[in-house]
Amino acid sequence: MSASVQSWTDRLDGKQAADVSALLERATAADGTAPVSEQGVHAVSGAGSDGVRHLVETDADRIVGYAQLQPGRGDHPAMAELAVDPAARGRGIGGRLVAEVLSEGGPDARVWAHGNLPAAQAVAQRLGLIGARELLQLRRPLADAELPELVVPEDISLRVYRGVEDDPEVLRVNAAAFAWHPEQGSWTERELAERRAEAWFDPSGLFMAFAASDDQRLLGFHWTKVHPKQGDEPAIGEVYVVAIGPDAQGRGLGRLLTLAGLHYLRDRGLGAVLLYVEGDNESALHTYDRLGFERFHTDVAYARA
């Protein structure tokens, strides 16, 4: 067996990007969960990848491991994601990738373990890492399940996305609502354009709330998403982004907008819906618990102790 070699690059070439994408697909099929986030997948192809660095581990010119390092911004640490080809596991590749990205990312760097699978836990224990952040995936059924009635208060106007004319307000509220969030809070027009170009994008699934007396200043929005059927897995809806402006908190808009999206997804014939929420976001967890969501799996960001 030949020794594998690691190398860093600021941008994957066309063949590397295709090989990494195929590796990620194999890892997803083997593990039942994607090893790299949506934002990370975009960065593989070079989209929205300012400052992102890529680490590939090759064996006889074949990519057997991949890691991606998102740079730190302000108070937010560098974040890494990685995957090992299922056919090359059990050779220490995952541990080497983790050690290298943490070294390159600086003392506060973190590495995601999506699904927190046993192999990832074993690597973390071996390297003396601790869980520094949790991202929970919650799910609830839609088919044959009751949903509360959608009642829009008289002082609120609810409508769907009309196009790029709405983007400035969407970005303003998103940045304010997720100022604490290292990935979501940094969205720009580029991120919106990338997602509008996706096959799943449907403007009628992006709900926007305004004061009835002011239809220019957005209070909050809920962007839904539909994941298509994959193999034996049926299509599933997602509460993709719920953002409420800080000046509109405490008015029940999170529940209202979430419920509007759930009715929309159910009306599209979807049997279930998922969402992601930070493990320490007690307010959001309370809202989703009341709407019938239950924990499905957990992503953990590991850091040095």
UniProtKB/Swiss-Prot annotation:
Subunit structure: Monomer.
Catalytic activity: 1D-myo-inositol 2-(L-cysteinylamino)-2-deoxy-alpha-D-glucopyranoside + acetyl-CoA = mycothiol + CoA + H(+)
Residues reported in the UniProt entry to bind 1D-myo-inositol 2-(L-cysteinylamino)-2-deoxy-alpha-D-glucopyranoside: E38, E183, K225, E238, Y276
Name used for this protein in its record: Mycothiol acetyltransferase
Name of the gene encoding the protein in the UniProt record: mshD
Binding-site residues for acetyl-CoA 2, renumbered to this chain: 242-244, 249-255, 281-286
Keyword Acyltransferase in record: yes
Keywords: Acyltransferase, Repeat, Transferase
PANTHER family: L-AMINO ACID N-ACETYLTRANSFERASE, MYCOTHIOL ACETYLTRANSFERASE
E.C. numbers: 2.3.1.189
